Amino acid sequence: MISYNQWLNNWRYFCRLCERFETCIHFVDDSVDNTGKLINGDTYSIEFCDILMSTSAEFENVTIQICKEIDPNFNDKSNIKALTKTITNKFPKIGETIISSPVQSFSPLRDWAESDEGTIKGIDWWGDHTDIKHQRYPNIKKASFQNCYNALSSLFVMELYASTFVTDGEPVLQISSSPCSYFSSEYLFDLIWPIPKKLPDFEEKDKNKEEL
């Protein structure tokens, strides 16, 4: 089981990554165009490279923790295909999870799935991080503002879902008292969201409880 202390360590690390990202906003404007993409999304740097690599590693770390909760025999050396299959089978509505930033509300994992060809779609930043990991300099342009934004918001979704294993279906309340500095969520209680919503995969469970 994911312990509270383990979850809190994950959450604090995520918040630290968000703080680093938010610091970059002082130098790179985070406005979006009419398609929802960051206008300066192609901007790249060593700092973005570090944030992307750290965020991707943490996404994998938290996702593995969730997979081991779903299946205690899950191999923690599994690749992204196995992670994707396990998560999306257990939580088919995870892609509906909405995350908010100062410039928009969106669903970062909306298209996350395994394609008919066996490739992973919907998290392009993951493939870019892999390219950087194996050959950083030729792929440094993939260490972009947009990839960091997408990776961090995707990690936020996984943090929310991981917290439900600590509290039996409810996001940990302490998230609200230790909020992320850049992203927010309608599934948490705070001044912006005074009445938090249920995570997409837990809405039906609550309806069933009410019927009982």
Predicted regions and their residues:
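Short, hydrophobic, well-ordered secondary-structure elements
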Residues: 45-70, 149-159
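Amphipathic, well-ordered alpha-helical segments in soluble domains
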Residues: 17-27, 54, 58-61, 125-128, ...
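Charge-enriched, short contiguous segments at helix-coil
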Residues: 132-163
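Short secondary-structure junctions and interdomain/linker hinges
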Residues: 28-31, 35, 94, 136-139, ...
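Short non-catalytic regulatory patches outside canonical folded cores
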Residues: 59-127, 133-138
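Charged alpha-helical initiation segments
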Residues: 1-53, 210
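Polyanionic, low-complexity intrinsically disordered segments
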Residues: 162-212
